[in-house]
Amino acid sequence: MFPLLHFIVLIDVKDFPLTEGSTITPLCQKGYFPCGNLTKCLPRAFHCDGVDDCGNGADEDNCGDTSGWATIFGTVHGNANNVALTQECFLNQYPQPCDCKGTELECINADLRAVPVISSNTTLLSLKKNKIHSLPDKVFTKYTQLKQIFLQHNCITHISRKAFFGLHNLQILYLSHNCITTLRPGVFKDLHQLTWLILDDNPITRISQQLFTGLKSLFFLSMVNNYLEALPKQMCAQMPQLNWMDLEGNGIKYLTNSSFLSCNSLTVLFLPRNQIDFVPEKTFSSLKNLGELDLSSNMIMELPPEIFKDLKLLQKLNLSSNPLLYLHKNQFESLKQLQSLDLERIEIPNINTRMFQPMMNLSHIYFKNFRYCSYAPHVRICMPLTDGISSFEDLLANNILRIFVWVIAFITCFGNLFVIGMRSFIKAENTTHATSIKILCCADCLMGVYLFFIGFFDIKYRGQYQKYALLWMESLQCRLMGFLAMLSTEVSVLLLTYLTLEKFLAIVFPFSNIRPGKWQTMVILICIWIVGFLIAVIPFWKEDYFGNFYGKNGVCFPLYYDQTEDIGSKGYSLGIFLGVNLLAFLIIVFSYTIMFCSIKKTALQTSEVRNPIGREVAVANRFFFIVFSDAICWIPVFVIKILSLFRVEIPGTITSWIVIFFLPVNSALNPILYTLTTSFFKDKLKQLLHKHRRKSIFKTKKKSLSTSIVWTDDSSSLKLGVLNKITLGDSIVKPIS
C-alpha cells in the first residue's frame, strides 16, 4: 500500500514569467485564473473562497454574479414604495386617517371603500390595504398632477375603461395583489407618461395588444403570478419603449415567433415558472438589445439549435429546472457577451467542452453536477462547489465516515494479511483450496488499500476539499484508486462464485469427477484475475467513450450513474453491476440453498447421526452468514443501480456510505467466514499453541480432520450425514484443508 503513496501529486500555485514592464494579463493553463496584473495564476477553486490567496486580493474581486440588469435598476418593488417625503403638508383636503407630507398622501389601511376626495395638487397617492372594490369612470380626473398611484392589497375586481382618464402625468401605477380578472382594451390610453405598471398577483387570464394602447413611455411591465395562458401577437406594439418585462409565475403554455416581434427595446425578459414546453427558433430574433433572459422552471424539453442566434448582447441566461433532454453543441455559439449561464437541475447527456468554448466572457456558470465544471475550465466561478458526496470542506462529509473508513480499512487489510500469513504457515492437506483462499484474501486486501487511500486523502484535503475537488476527481491518483476498488470487487466476486460452485459440486454431487485438480485450479485462478483486471482497466482504454469513468465523485467509485452519463460508461457500469455481479450473487444464493437442502435430506436419511437438529442449525447458521454478507454487500448496490434506471434522484452522500460501510463487507468478513471461524483453523491453531503439551490430542484431532470433506474447512459445521452419503467414495473426494 505505502509505495503507492508516491503517486500523490501536490497541487501547487503556478507562476508564469512575463517580460519586464509587461502589464498584460498572464496566460494561465486550463483551469487556472490570473491574480490581477500579477504573474501568478491560481486554480479556479482558490478564487472567491473568502481567502486572499493571491496576496493582492484579486482572487476575491468580482465574485458576485452581477451580470444582467437587476443591479442597475435596483429592487424595483422596494424603490417604488420608499418615497422621500417632506415634513410639511401642502394639501388642503384629505381624509383624517391619511398621512400627508408635502404633496404626497398615504392612506394605508384606512378602511377606505372608495377613492377619497383629496386636493387637486396631490402628486403621490397611496391607498394600499384598503377595501376598494372598483374604480369607476374618471375617478382620478380631478387629480391631473398625480405621478404615482399605489393601490396594492385592495380587492379591486372592476376597473372602468375611463378610470384613469386625464392622468397624463402619471409615471408609476401599482395594481398588484388585487382581484382583477380582466382589463378592458384602452384602459391605460391616457397614461402617456407612465413608466412603471405593476399588475402582480391578480387572477388575470387574458390580455390583448390593445390593452396597452397609450403606453408609449412604459419602461417596466410586471405581471408576476397572474393566470395568463398565452401572450398576444406583437405584445410590445403599443409599448415601443418597454425595457423590462416580467411574466414570472403565470400559466403561459407556448410562445410564437411573433410574441416579441416589436419588442426592440427590451433588455430584460423574465418568463420563469410558466408551462412553456417549446420555444420556436425565431421567438427572440427581434430582441437585439436583450441583456437578460430567464426561462427557468418551465417544461421545455428541446431548444432549437439557433434560438439564441440574434441575442448578441445577452449577458445573463437562465435555463435551470427545465426537463431538457438535449443541448446542441452550438447552442450557445453566438452568445459572445454572455457572463452568466444557469443550467442547474438540467441533465446534459451530451455535454462537451466545445459547447461552452465560444462564451469567452463567461464568468459564472451553474450546473446540476459538480463534475460538469470540468467541461468549462475557462469559467472562473462554477457551481456547485462539491459533488454531493463530500461536504463543502471535507472529502468525507461527517465524523462517522472519517472514523470508520480507517476502522474498516484496518480490519479488511490486516485481517486478510493475517489469514494469508497463517494459511502459508499452517500446512494444509488440500493445497489447491488453501491457495484459492489466499488468492481471495489478496483480492480483498486491495479493498483495504483503497479505503486507506480514501482516509489519507480525506486528511490531506480536510477543511479545504472544495478547492481541490475537481482537480482531485480528474487526477491519476483518483483513477488508480477506483481501478483498485473495481479490481478487488470483481476478482472477489468471481472467486467467491468459483469457491461456491466448487463446494456445491462436492456436497450435492459427491461422486462426480468434474471437480478441478491442482493445475486446473491454478488456471482458473489466473483467468479470474485476468478477467477482473480487464474489467477494471477497460475504461482507461477509450476515454472519449467512457469519460472519466472512476472520477465521477470524491470516492472515485463508479457506483451511481444518472441519465447524463455517456452511453458507454453508463452501459458498462450497468453491465458489471446488474450483469456480472447480480448473476454471481444469484448463483451463490441458489447454490447455498440447494446445498443446505441436500445436507438436510441426507441427515434425515442417515440414522447414525446422533444430533441431526443441532448439526442442521450449525450448517444453516454458517450458510446464512455467508449469504447474508453477500446480501449486505450487493443488495444496496443493486437497488441504487435499478433506481438510476428509473431516473430516481439519490442523494450523493449515499455513495460514500455504501462504499465505506457496505461494499467492503465481503472483504472484511471473508477471512472470518472462510478461515478464522472454521473448525480446521481453530483446531490447527490450538495444535500449534499446545504442540508440546498435548501431542496426543493433536494426533486425535488430526485423524478426525482427515476424514472431513467440507470445502469450507469446517468439519463440525456440516452434517456427518454427508460422510455416510459418500462412505464408499472417501477416496474420490480429497479432504479439504
UniProtKB/Swiss-Prot annotation:
Name by which UniProt lists this protein: Relaxin receptor 2
Membrane topology type: Multi-pass membrane protein
Keywords noted in UniProt: Cell membrane, Disulfide bond, G-protein coupled receptor, Glycoprotein, Leucine-rich repeat, Membrane, Receptor, Repeat, Transducer, Transmembrane, Transmembrane helix
Keyword flag Cell membrane: yes
Principal subcellular localization: membrane
Entry-linked InterPro entries: GPCR_Rhodpsn, GPCR_Rhodpsn_7TM, LDL_receptor-like_sf, LDLR_class-A_CS, LDrepeatLR_classA_rpt, Leu-rich_rpt, Leu-rich_rpt_typical-subtyp, LRR_dom_sf
UniProt xrefs under SUPFAM superfamilies: Family A G protein-coupled receptor-like, L domain-like, LDL receptor-like module
Top-rank taxon: Eukaryota
First and last residues of every LRR repeat: 121-142, 145-166, 169-190, 193-214, 217-238, 241-262, 265-286, 289-310, 313-334, 337-358
GO molecular function (one): G protein-coupled peptide receptor activity
Glycosylated residues in this chain: N37, N121, N257, N318, N361
CDD domains per record: LDLa
Disulfide bonds: C28-C41, C35-C54, C48-C63, C478-C556
One Pfam match: 7tm_1
Cytoplasmic compartment residues: 421-438, 502-520, 597-622, 675-737
Stretches assigned to the Extracellular side: 1-399, 460-478, 542-575, 644-653
Presence of keyword Metal-binding: no
